[in-house]
Amino acid sequence: MKKLLIMAAGTGGHIFPGLAIADTMQARGWEVTWLGTEHGMERDLVPKSGIAMDTISFAGLRGKGLRHTVTGVLRLLASFGTCFSILARRKPGVVLGMGGYVTVPGGWMAKLRGVPLVLLNADAALLLSNKALTPIAQRVLFGFPADFGNAADKALVTGNPVRAEISALMPPAQRYAQHSGALKILVVGGSLGAQALNAALPAALALIPAEQRPLVTHQSGKKNIDDLRARYAQAGVTAEVVDFIDDMPRRYADADLVICRAGAITVSELTAAGVASVLVPLLVSTTTHQRDNAHWMEQQQAAIHLPQSELTAQGLADLLQNMTREKCKQMAEAAYANGRRDANAAIADVLEKLVKNT
């Protein structure tokens, strides 16, 4: 039996596409195992999917102070030995890194053991971890057309893996033709929520006359749901507030407009489904990945790029009042034209070509 080890940890942006690929490979008869950490979302999501998971304690190095950095270096060194043992025991025929710190020790130990390494770079810019591993990787797969940097001779644009139910949605022209009444807005803060969106949306909607307001579903993140419900109540705005959405295909199908961050997997889902969006990139001092993703979407006329520094209640209220279903449909069709609904199969085909019999 062919065997795949997936390396992914932390937030949904790394884990959900890994799970999508796991489903694809299992459907092809492969055995899939997972390398993650003890503290990320994968701790719950991966076992629930019936995938065996091994963990390391390494948790990244950047931006958390000298003490954390020193501790991180020591854990990184220890994790190399742990990864070597995991690979020896699992005997994968190919290793797939989904980006992020967990891929570094696992990737180098794959090289040491002679196991082919494939990297998925979800964003429009090359991730630091992938830059470090590119020299030893057989292939670097990109979610979007990009400056391939030092990966040019190994690069292949496959798109990012998304759930089959999202790719299978009706094209936007058909979906939007079925929509009527007030605009339906879906606000998605990601697996951890987005405080800037949680603050801006209730205030913006309060500035719109009640008879002109769109219908809103707002995903808050588990920690923020009580606070967000209180914000909407204080603003006198009716909204459906949920902590987590487990039926995203239906939510995308129902929405005229999505307001969200610009993570690579979110953008890939928006293009695969064909949904209009307002993208508010997360401000991170160490990377510009989300800004690059949002800029790319705006260039395709598939989204509105709204920098967080320009996110105000009045500005957002004006934007929403000037939005029409026809404008949303045009953005959605542009997004759909740039979607890769064959990404799962394209990535799977690469793995099939490189797998080493064990």
Swiss-Prot record:
Record-linked CDD domains: GT28_MurG
Annotated organism of origin: Herminiimonas arsenicoxydans
Record's bilayer topology term: Peripheral membrane protein
Residues involved in UDP-N-acetyl-alpha-D-glucosamine binding: 11-13, 163, 191, 245, 290
Family from the record: Belongs to the glycosyltransferase 28 family. MurG subfamily.
Organism ancestry: Bacteria, Pseudomonadati, Pseudomonadota, Betaproteobacteria, Burkholderiales
Record EC number: 2.4.1.227
Enzyme class: transferase
Cellular-component GO terms for this entry: plasma membrane
Pathway where it operates: Cell wall biogenesis; peptidoglycan biosynthesis
Protein name per its UniProtKB record: UDP-N-acetylglucosamine--N-acetylmuramyl-(pentapeptide) pyrophosphoryl-undecaprenol N-acetylglucosamine transferase
Localisation per UniProt entry: Cell inner membrane
Primary localisation category: membrane
GO BP annotation list: carbohydrate metabolic process; cell division; cell wall organization; lipid glycosylation; peptidoglycan biosynthetic process; regulation of cell shape
Listed InterPro entries: GlcNAc_MurG, Glyco_trans_28_C, GlycoTrans_28_N
Keyword annotations: Cell cycle, Cell division, Cell inner membrane, Cell membrane, Cell shape, Cell wall biogenesis/degradation, Glycosyltransferase, Membrane, Peptidoglycan synthesis, Transferase
Catalytic activity: di-trans,octa-cis-undecaprenyl diphospho-N-acetyl-alpha-D-muramoyl-L-alanyl-D-glutamyl-meso-2,6-diaminopimeloyl-D-alanyl-D-alanine + UDP-N-acetyl-alpha-D-glucosamine = di-trans,octa-cis-undecaprenyl diphospho-[N-acetyl-alpha-D-glucosaminyl-(1->4)]-N-acetyl-alpha-D-muramoyl-L-alanyl-D-glutamyl-meso-2,6-diaminopimeloyl-D-alanyl-D-alanine + UDP + H(+)
Molecular function GO labels: UDP-N-acetyl-D-glucosamine:N-acetylmuramoyl-L-alanyl-D-glutamyl-meso-2,6-diaminopimelyl-D-alanyl-D-alanine-diphosphoundecaprenol 4-beta-N-acetylglucosaminlytransferase activity; undecaprenyldiphospho-muramoylpentapeptide beta-N-acetylglucosaminyltransferase activity
UniProt key word Nucleotide-binding: no
Function field: Cell wall formation. Catalyzes the transfer of a GlcNAc subunit on undecaprenyl-pyrophosphoryl-MurNAc-pentapeptide (lipid intermediate I) to form undecaprenyl-pyrophosphoryl-MurNAc-(pentapeptide)GlcNAc (lipid intermediate II).
Gene3D superfamilies: Glycogen Phosphorylase B
